[in-house]
Regions:
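Outer-membrane beta-barrel translocator/receptor signature
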Residues: 1-41, 47-57, 69, 129-133, ...
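Transmembrane beta-strands of outer-membrane beta-barrel proteins
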Residues: 26-30, 71-73, 146-148, 197-202, ...
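Solvent-exposed loop segments that connect transmembrane elements
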Residues: 39-48, 85-118, 164-171, 214-258, ...
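Outer-membrane beta-barrel domain signature, strongest for Gram-negative TonB-dependent receptors
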Residues: 46, 52-199, 205-211
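Membrane-embedded beta-barrel scaffold of Gram-negative outer-membrane proteins
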Residues: 136-161, 362-364, 379, 388-485, ...
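Transmembrane beta-strands of outer-membrane beta-barrel pores
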Residues: 2-8, 32-36, 77-81, 141, ...
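Outer-membrane beta-barrel channels and translocator barrels
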Residues: 21-22, 33, 64-68, 141-142, ...
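Gram-negative outer-membrane beta-barrel transporters
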Residues: 189, 197-199, 203-205, 280, ...
Length: 559
């Protein structure tokens, strides 16, 4: 099979099916895809941002040793090299201007020529090699079916991002992941056609994940992000009456904020589900199920940053006395080495009732409890490293022989700095951990078959109550995206779909969905110096991001 489309999109694939005997058959194939890209990067001579190449192959074999035993094997590998991340500049946001005014500052647009343009100087890309393999063994006894599914996955990938997404040479990240995952599921279930349909199973999963993600601050980034931010803080201090004048100079041409992380995950589950058909009356069925989930997540982290070589000047006028102190040869290291772990135990029930009055005509209602795993934000270590670097720089100043340890003014300077530029405490666990997400889901609907089996209709209404909802957002420093928990949200809506066979050759389909998803308890507060908390953002009643309010699909098929 070969195909082509606009914007230099091409694909080719080859598949072979072969049956060697009544007991064994297999299929194998390969593919290659090229995408020319659509979005252009103005900072790289209008280079296509999203061009990509991908290729791979697969094998599947089915072996029947006997009439009641089947072995299904699958193996696939895919390699892809993609451009991406077509983020364009929208200009300074009104909220940023308002926040600056609150802090007594004024923000002006200095990149007006780049508004609406994708413009960053380093090529951003994602490269991945993915191997999947699995074996499904199924044994059919007289009264039950026993199946065992074993899976293995190997992932090697590399993500490179120009993280400032501008034409300036500020900073970038190269994140690499190496993951090995093995899973096993054993299911014992009733054979079809029985009044009592039941299934009991056990599931186990273990993943080894090794991640490296150094952030490289280039010369402009060292100046604008490290040096200028520090001096801005000193300027705020110096603006106070009687305060000293302070200034910092960073000598590093570049600065690497690195990290190596091992985040293994262990998961296991036991579950059972029973469906009682024709309960009390013909066509009425009731389903009840329960799943016990256990999950243990851990993280071993080793985050090391290039020591900052910096100088510091301190000037203070105290009556007739002029204090002028300086040290241009200080070093400030920053590192985090340690481990974290946590585990969760969950009970996830399921209830359903259905009434079917004719084949493929029914009404139903379901209630389920949902759960999404928690985890660790390893990209938060870039923010933590910046905070630790600032703390380390303050400590270096305090320990400097010519400043903090000055025989005459050292103690005075240390006391002043402790009051004006206090060290920030760092809680690695609180800063990097996000909690699981929980939900209760309710749905009622109907499946209808009409027009002598030529028209199918599906309608449903749903309601979802979510707690500790997980959201993706940029870290405060801009160094990567993180997952946060956002209190509570509520979603409700309806869906409808129609599919019609107009003739033997022609079928038409249309579907529509409406979802109203809003936060019900999501308020962000910030602790003030006096210990009180100030509301900085109130999202109650606001829409949950990335949940479309309306979806519509219209299609047809002629064959």
């Amino acid at each position: 099979r070969m195909g082509a489309a606009t914007y230099n999109n091409y694909n080719v694939s080859l598949t072979h099916y072969h049956r060697t005997s009544d007991r064994f058959a297999f299929s194998t194939g390969g593919f290659y895809e090229h995408t020319g890209g659509f979005f252009e990067n103005s900072a790289r001579n209008n280079e296509k941002v999203d061009k990509s190449n991908a290729g791979g192959g697969r094998f599947r074999g089915i072996y029947l040793p006997s009439s009641n035993l089947k072995i299904d094997m699958a193996l696939s590998y895919e390699y892809s090299d993609q451009g991406g991340y077509p983020y364009y500049y929208t200009g300074i946001t009104p909220s940023a201007i308002a926040k600056a005014k609150e802090n007594g500052k004024e923000m002006t647009e200095d990149r007006a020529d780049y508004i609406g343009k994708i413009s960053y100087n380093d090529r951003s890309s994602y490269r991945r090699g993915l191997l999947n393999s699995g074996v499904n063994i199924e044994y059919q006894a007289n009264n039950f079916i026993l199946s065992a599914v074993t899976g293995y996955q190997n992932l090697n990938d590399r993500m490179f991002l120009d993280q400032d997404f501008t034409e300036r040479d500020i900073f970038n990240i190269e994140q690499k992941q190496r993951a090995n995952t093995i899973s096993e599921e054993i299911v014992l279930k009733a054979k079809p056609g029985k009044r009592w349909q039941w299934a009991t199973g056990a599931f186990g999963f273990y993943q080894w994940l090794h991640t490296t993600g150094p952030v490289l601050f280039k010369e402009e980034g060292v100046k604008s992000v490290i040096e200028n931010n520090a001096n801005s803080a000193f300027e705020e201090v110096s603006a106070k009456p009687g305060a000293p004048t302070m200034g910092m100079t960073v000598h590093n041409p570049t600065l690497s904020v690195g990290g190596t992380f091992d985040t293994p995950t262990l998961s296991g589950a036991l579950y059972h589900q029973s469906t009682f058909n024709n309960l009390f009356i013909e066509g009425l069925s009731v389903t009840a199920g329960l799943r016990l989930d256990y999950e243990k997540i851990s993280m071993k982290y080793n985050s090391l940053s290039t020591p900052i070589d910096f100088g510091f000047d301190f000037h203070l006028a105290m009556g007739p006395n002029q204090i002028n102190l300086s040290d241009q040869n200080m070093k400030a290291p920053a590192s985090f080495v340690g481990k974290l772990s946590t585990d969760y135990v969950q009970l996830l029930p399921k209830f359903a009732i259905q009434y079917e009055w004719k084949n493929q005509n029914n009404v139903y209602a379901t209630v389920t409890r949902g759960y999404r795993s928690g985890g660790y934000n390893i990209q938060m270590f870039s923010d933590l490293s910046q905070t630790e670097l600032k703390n380390s720089m303050m400590n270096a100043i305090k320990e400097s022989p010519t400043i903090g340890q000055d025989a005459t003014w050292g103690k005075t300077i240390i006391n002043m700095m402790n009051q004006m530029v206090p060290a920030k405490e760092i809680d690695v666990k609180a800063s990097t951990t996000y909690k699981p997400e929980y939900s209760w889901n309710y749905e009622a609907g109907s499946h209808l078959t009409l027009w002598e089996g030529r028209l199918w209709a599906d309608v449903a209404a749903f309601y979802m109550d979510t707690r500790d909802q997980q959201l993706s957002q940029f870290a405060e420093s801009g160094l990567g995206r993180i997952t946060i928990n956002a209190g509570k949200s509520r979603s409700y809506g309806a869906e409808a779909a129609l599919r019609a066979s107009v003739t033997k050759e022609l079928s038409l389909n249309v579907s529509y969905g409406y979802t109203y998803a809003t936060f019900t308890d999501y308020v962000i507060t910030e602790e003030q110096k006096d210990g009180t908390f100030k509301v900085t953002a109130d999202y109650n009643g606001k829409y949950v991001p990335f949940v479309p309010k309306h979806t519509l699909n219209i299609g047809g098929e002629y064959a």
